[in-house]
Regions:
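A general structural signal for well-ordered alpha-helical segments in protein cores
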Residues: 47, 78, 119, 137-138, ...
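Active-site pre-lysine segment of PLP-dependent enzymes
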Residues: 8-25, 37-59, 68-104
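Short beta-strand segments
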Residues: 30-32, 63-66, 96, 108, ...
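Conserved PLP-binding catalytic core of the aspartate aminotransferase-like
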Residues: 7, 159-160, 175-214
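Conserved small/polar residues in nucleotide/adenosyl-binding loops
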Residues: 1-5, 217-224
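Flexible low-complexity scaffold tracts in large eukaryotic assembly proteins
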Residues: 1, 33-36
């Protein structure tokens, strides 16, 4: 079950919303922080409040996607769920990989930490569906994780500069607003202010899809 969030909540679920959503059929609570595509990042206190709710429901497991853990900006800090709620460790599956922080998307390497029986079952299923990642990908991932990681902070600084530029430009546009993301490398602007306006072709913009169509343009080739 998806629980929609908006700008007013920072695109983050509240403890009360989580509790109201859980029922006997709920199997997993899936959390992505920092988030794709909003860039929202949960604080330690926010995670603790969610953990307090989940303690009441032993039939619900927790899956956390920590792929953007190294891409955090300003004074925000990353906290993984299993570390701030160790009493829920046996019910928590932590997912991560080298795609984002290490710019290794094509190497297709991810990893997980969790209950031993669950990890074993995951390995059995994965080995029969996609076989195994290549040896060179595995060796490269080990080197990335164990090697000099100083470049990560340098890259995060570059991403922050791009974020700041985009936020400034987006918020200077009539009808567009965009909150400042705490992490990852996305911005998630709202185009509510342009709905109902007339585009350059004298057509009324009725929804977000029509607005994105207005943004498309054709770029001639150099030979033209």
């Amino acid at each position: 079950m998806y629980k929609r969030q908006g700008e007013e909540s920072g695109f983050k679920i509240t403890p009360q919303q989580l509790e109201n959503t859980i029922n006997q059929s709920t199997k997993w609570f899936i959390l992505n922080s920092p988030s794709n595509p909003t860039g929202s990042c949960y604080t330690k206190n926010e995670l603790l409040e969610l953990a307090n709710v989940l303690k009441k429901y032993p039939h619900v497991n927790i899956m956390t996607d920590d792929l953007y853990e190294h891409l955090i900006y300003d004074n925000n800090e990353f906290h993984t769920f299993a570390s701030i709620a160790p009493e829920l460790k046996e019910r928590t599956l932590t997912l991560n990989g080298v795609s984002k922080a290490y710019a290794m998307t094509g190497w297709r390497i991810g990893y997980a930490g969790g209950n031993a029986s669950l990890i074993k079952a995951m390995g059995k299923l994965q080995s029969q569906s996609t076989s195994n990642p290549t040896s060179i990908s595995q060796a490269a991932a080990v080197e990335a994780l164990n090697g000099d990681n100083s470049f990560i902070a340098e890259r995060a600084k570059v991403f922050k500069g791009r974020r700041d530029f985009l936020i400034n430009e987006l918020n200077s546009m009539n009808g567009i607003t965009c909150r400042v993301p705490e992490g990852a490398f996305y911005v998630f602007p709202s185009c509510k202010g342009v709905i109902g306006k007339i585009d350059e072709s004298n057509n009324k913009i009725s929804n977000d899809e029509e607005f994105t169509t207005c943004l498309l343009y054709t770029s001639p080739s150099p030979r033209d």
